[in-house]
Amino acid sequence: MEQFLDNIKDLEVTTVARAQEALDNKETATFFIGRKTCPYCRKFAGTLAGVVAETKANIYFINSEEPSQLKELQEFRSRYGIPTVPGFVHIADGQINVRCDSSMSAQEIKDFAGL
């Protein structure tokens, strides 16, 4: 689990409200929703860390175990069809695209997030 924390160290920890704000304001932003206790999230975080190191992309992280975010996150996940973690969310022009696939390759991550 320490490796997970190391893998997400270059991500910007944020809240569900920030993701909704990006949608509402038609920003372009990418979010990783996950938790350190999820083996699939740990796998995805390792691949994502390599992409971030290579591209210097700004990716946001929403901790799905953050007690203060549970209600908001549940509503957000329900509203936008994010059934499981890891949830990889890319927002552009008020549209949201979601992938929940821990086996995404580095190239798939880059393609999905437009990196």
Predicted features, each with a name:
Residues 67-85:
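Short Fe-S-cluster ligation motifs
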Residues 1-29, 115:
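N-terminal leader/targeting and pre-domain segments
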Residues 35, 64, 100-103:
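Conserved residues at beta->alpha junctions
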Residues 83-115:
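Non-catalytic, surface beta->alpha helical segment in thiol-disulfide oxidoreductase systems
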Residues 39-40, 68, 97:
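Glycine-/small-residue-rich active-site loops that bind phosphorylated ligands and cofactors
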Residues 18-57:
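Local sequence-structure signature of Cys/Sec-based thiol-disulfide redox active-site neighborhoods
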Residues 33, 56-73:
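Thiol-based oxidoreductase modules, predominantly thioredoxin-like and allied folds used
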